[in-house]
Amino acid sequence: MTIAIGQNQERGIFDLIDDWLKKDRFVFVGWSGLLLFPTAYLAVGGWMTGTTFVTSWYTHGLASSYLEGCNFLTAAVSSPANSMGHSLLLLWGPEAQGDFTRWCQIGGLWTFVALHGSFGLIGFCLRQFEIARLVGIRPYNAIAFSGPIAVFVSVFLLYPLGQASWFFAPSFGVAAIFRFLLFLQGFHNWTLNPFHMMGVAGILGGALLCAIHGATVENTLFEDGDAANTFRAFTPTQSEETYSMVTANRFWSQIFGVAFSNKRWLHFFMLFVPVTGLWTSAIGIVGLALNLRAYDFVSQELRAAEDPEFETFYTKNILLNEGIRAWMAAQDQPHENFVFPEEVLPRGNAL
């Protein structure tokens, strides 16, 4: 008879750390948490600090904090001054030289929030990968979350990198984002950009699919319990489905003439539409960073210039964009001291 005696393998420091990080607790930490939690905490903390106390007087000539009288919709952490270029604006860098007050004044909090926010989003994506692997499911949640990451990185980092400085990035605030949207329209004609059109179709299409799917499932729930409502009839361990896919298919076949007959294809489509919309929007913003133009219908512009009675919605929008540029530039970039004489301001029956 042979007796095999096993020896306990000596566990290294990596194994001990791995065990602690993946320990079953109320809030899972994991290796991704080492990136997610510090960066997300600092990004949110930096934004709350900036919107509460820090002025934008030295960067945009604006009041932007609760301390100065702003509210939740008008407060913001504003982008750095144009003169700062694409500097990382480190607290210990040559611009601030360790002076926290000066660092806040020149816009250091914006780069702080933008960079930590980017890494926080990446950490959250990695968290979904990590937990999916531990639970034993596919990582489509993490893949879907690549869409918001792509939009954030393209808007807040890649667009200003293609422009003159961080100054042209959106500031972190509600009204500040609206100002940025007007800027994109006036200077890039963003709404006529095909990538923006695909993005709108993806986001609104995803919302439509979500509403239809939720309503259809609610409509076809099996009432297989004796409780007061159908929610209690569901148990997490039940073997049968909770709603009738066959009935749902029958319903939409009668409505449209076609319907999803496969749950996998249905849910993949619900994943694909909004994520593709986010990615196409991100690609479009990278195009704006390089100053790529949207659709130009020059023949309509030439005819409108020759014939005062000819006008289209396109030529209307071109005039409106000229107005946005002329009246916004002086307000938006006070450091340039723009002065536009009356004869260069846009004219026409569109305005």
Swiss-Prot record:
Annotated cofactor note:
The D1/D2 heterodimer binds P680, chlorophylls that are the primary electron donor of PSII, and subsequent electron acceptors. It shares a non-heme iron and each subunit binds pheophytin, quinone, additional chlorophylls, carotenoids and lipids. There is also a Cl(-1) ion associated with D1 and D2, which is required for oxygen evolution. The PSII complex binds additional chlorophylls, carotenoids and specific lipids.
Which Pfam family, giving just one, matches this sequence? Photo_RC
| Location in or out of the cell | Plastid, Chloroplast thylakoid membrane
Give membrane topology per the record.
Multi-pass membrane protein
Q: Where are the transmembrane segments?
A: 39-59, 123-139, 151-164, 206-226, 277-293
Please cite one Gene Ontology biological process associated with this protein: photosynthetic electron transport in photosystem II
Write down the EC number.
1.10.3.9
Subunit structure of this chain's protein: PSII is composed of 1 copy each of membrane proteins PsbA, PsbB, PsbC, PsbD, PsbE, PsbF, PsbH, PsbI, PsbJ, PsbK, PsbL, PsbM, PsbT, PsbX, PsbY, PsbZ, Psb30/Ycf12, at least 3 peripheral proteins of the oxygen-evolving complex and a large number of cofactors. It forms dimeric complexes.
User: What more does the record tell us?
Assistant: 2 of the reaction center chlorophylls (ChlD1 and ChlD2) are entirely coordinated by water.
Name of the protein in question: Photosystem II D2 protein
